[in-house]
């Protein structure tokens, strides 16, 4: 392992990370091209010496800081020692890494080192964005002679608190191999470049929210007073103020090719909004959060539809989840359902205040349309067919609404330390005979979607103003890595 042996500043560390990463990526691409064109195998001795490896970032603390900050949710050491991780795409993560390093460098006097690791970059992750042209017949040979993805080396043990103490402590929740794995999946599922993702995320489970988001987004990028400068759409479409007929340029066929298409309303400072249509079901919700978490978003909110479970609710009312009954089952092995998922005060307050502001219902009046309570998330699309069992469970939990995604998203936020929240809109009341019918559904959608989406956007504006205060200490484990 190469060691420069000098204490780097955060800026120097980032420059060195980018330098080492680019060296490895270029070497791997050149070796692949030489193999494809000439059949030349990579030099095994050069590989042993780190020809294709990720750079590693290490931060050491001697425990001498007299008064380490206790109120921050990140940028803290739990004990003296050396913390390390491997890094991929340092240019993409530069702002994030710089923020984290500056905190420990200035507050703790931490020692920062950058060197080459022993973990090789899998070849599939360097092909995109290069001039390499490969066909399927080459796959077996490349897998045999070049580093490739090994699932045994990829996991969420650190995020789940399952890592085994050793010589080094983990510096971050995700190492380079885990990050690269998810970056590739994000592009595949959403149809957009990972560079376009914004830190404030809205999830929805209905395409009509997408239509409204696109309409509003296009109006924003034409407004000279708006901070939004572009709209990145699933299928590789990029809309700016110069785009003629922007809504017509966004093809339905483009996003329909992707399982969970995304749209990114971009700001010049990278503090915009991403909307992901996750479709229906907890499996999709888990999948997108597994991969989106590596980008370390500032918040994700579920803005979708639900079934109202209380007689006093009306179609079009809102539900602000403050607790979850997790009948989704997709996370039971890593986060048992008896583990409580706490609500995040800052997020709850933002969603509540945004609902008051957008609906125009001040003070106590907003409670006529906004119900706070427990949301059930189920993995059974036809839960109504087991009415006797379902009704008893709903009654015991005091649930006010049911859907198929919200608890999964909240649980994933809890796992990955991403602030989370849920504001749902009642689209039917199956326990009280008000079920979805085609004509009723259309009238409901037309009246509710615009306001509901605007509440989500307004909540993001409020949360953006919170800055680092948005991140909650209640999501920290006992041995939390220093980086957010």
Predicted regions and their residues:
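Accessory terminal and edge-of-domain segments that mediate assembly/interaction
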Residues: 1-299, 307-484
């Amino acid at each position: 392992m190469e060691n420069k042996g000098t204490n780097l500043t955060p800026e120097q560390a980032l420059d060195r990370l980018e330098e080492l990463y680019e060296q490895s990526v270029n070497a791997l691409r050149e070796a692949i091209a030489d193999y494809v064109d000439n059949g030349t195998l990579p030099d095994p001795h050069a590989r042993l010496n780190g020809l294709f490896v990720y750079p590693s970032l290490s931060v050491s603390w001697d425990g001498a800081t007299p008064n380490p900050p206790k109120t921050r949710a990140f940028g803290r050491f739990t004990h003296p020692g050396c913390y390390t991780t491997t890094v991929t795409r340092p240019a993409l993560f530069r702002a994030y890494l710089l923020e984290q390093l500056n905190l420990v460098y200035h507050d703790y006097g931490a020692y920062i080192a950058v060197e080459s690791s022993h973990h090789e970059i899998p070849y599939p992750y360097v092909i995109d964005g290069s001039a390499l042209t490969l066909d399927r017949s080459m796959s077996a040979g490349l897998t045999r002679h070049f580093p490739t993805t090994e699932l045994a080396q990829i996991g969420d043990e650190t995020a789940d608190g399952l890592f085994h103490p050793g010589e080094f402590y983990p510096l971050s929740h995700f190492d380079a191999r885990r990050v690269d794995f998810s970056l590739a999946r994000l592009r595949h599922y959403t149809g957009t470049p990972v560079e376009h993702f914004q830190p404030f995320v809205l999830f929805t489970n209905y395409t009509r929210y997408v239509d409204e988001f696109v309409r509003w987004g296009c109006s924003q990028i034409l407004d000279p007073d708006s901070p939004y400068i572009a709209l990145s759409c699933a299928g590789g479409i990029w809309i700016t103020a110069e785009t003629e007929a922007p809504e017509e340029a966004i093809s339905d066929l483009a996003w329909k090719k992707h399982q969970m298409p995304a749209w990114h309303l971009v700001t010049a400072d990278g503090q915009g909004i991403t909307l992901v249509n996750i479709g229906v079901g907890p499996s999709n919700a888990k999948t997108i959060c597994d991969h989106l978490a590596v980008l370390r978003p500032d918040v994700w909110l579920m803005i979708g539809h639900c079934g109202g479970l209380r007689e006093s609710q009306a179609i079009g009312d809102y539900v602000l989840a403050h607790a979850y009954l997790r009948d989704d089952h997709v996370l039971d092995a890593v986060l048992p359902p008896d583990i409580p998922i706490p609500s995040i005060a800052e997020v709850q307050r933002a969603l509540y205040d945004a609902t008051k502001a957008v609906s125009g219902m001040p003070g106590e009046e907003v409670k006529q349309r906004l119900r706070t309570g427990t949301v059930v998330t189920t993995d059974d699309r036809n839960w109504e067919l087991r009415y006797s069992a379902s009704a008893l469970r709903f009654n015991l939990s005091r649930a006010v609404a049911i859907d198929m995604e919200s608890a999964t998203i909240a649980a994933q936020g809890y796992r990955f330390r991403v602030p989370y929240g849920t504001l749902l809109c009642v689209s039917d009341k199956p326990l009280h005979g008000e079920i979805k019918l085609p004509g009723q559904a259309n009238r409901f959608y037309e009246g509710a979607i615009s306001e509901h989406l605007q509440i989500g956007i307004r909540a993001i504006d409020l949360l953006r103003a919170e800055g680092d205060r948005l991140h909650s200490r209640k999501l920290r484990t006992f041995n939390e890595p220093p980086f957010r």
